[in-house]
A protein has these predicted regions:
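Beta-strand-rich binding/interaction modules
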Residues: 76-77, 92, 96-152
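Amphipathic alpha-helical substructures
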Residues: 3, 8-101
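Terminal end segments
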Residues: 167-169
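Compositionally biased low-complexity segments at domain edges in trafficked proteins
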Residues: 172-173
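Composition- and surface-driven signal marking solvent-exposed, interaction-prone regions
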Residues: 36-39, 115-117, 159-161
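Short acidic/polar inter-strand loop motif in beta-rich domains
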Residues: 149-164
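Generic detector of intrinsically disordered, low-complexity, polar/charged segments
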Residues: 12-15, 120, 158
Length: 173
């Protein structure tokens, strides 16, 4: 649904930028993430070529996206479209029944969002790719499944909304 400007531009908007970078760093890996960051700030990702005083550059978001895509040889525009151009966070919709765990991404713009997800099954942590916005895994009823146990992927978590509702109720008392 639609989000009001009051909801979109609350104090959480600043945290969203940090979480977006946190997710990008996890997705790219440290080496590639810092190469892209150095190139964005200094015009080179080659640290030894930097000499003091180091002059930072003024760049824009699209330049950073272009740097990330070029250095990774992949197109991550889908991620930036959802995280930076939409107020609503992507939601990972899950269901577990009949021996299957089904996961799918839902975004406010109904565009593909192939964000991989780390999932721990009985303590075995693996990263699962999303081919067609949907992932289905076979799991036993007794299996302990934890989705994104280290909170690497920025996404909407319904529990956050419940906490906000409870805070509002307490304020009214």
């Amino acid at each position: 649904g639609q989000i009001t400007s009051e909801q979109a531009f609350n104090s959480d908007i600043y945290g969203k930028g940090g979480w977006t970078l946190h997710t990008l760093r996890w997705l790219l890996g440290d080496e590639l993430f810092w190469q892209a960051t150095r190139e964005l700030l200094y015009g080179t990702n080659d640290s030894p070529s930097l000499t003091y005083p180091i002059q930072t550059r003024y760049r824009n978001t699209q330049e950073f996206i272009d740097i990330v895509n070029r250095l990774s040889s992949k197109d991550y525009t889908w991620m930036f479209d959802v995280y930076l151009k939409q107020a609503a966070l992507p939601e990972l919709v899950t269901s577990r029944q009949n021996g299957q765990l089904s996961l799918s991404w839902r975004t406010s713009i109904n565009k593909p969002f192939p964000m991989p997800v780390p999932i721990s099954i009985n303590g075995d942590l693996q990263v699962y790719p999303f081919e067609n916005d949907t992932l289905t895994l076979d799991v036993e009823a007794r299996d302990k499944v934890i989705i994104d146990p280290e909170m690497k992927v920025l996404r909407y978590l319904p529990i956050i909304g419940l906490c906000e509702e409870n805070l509002e109720k307490r304020k009214k008392r």
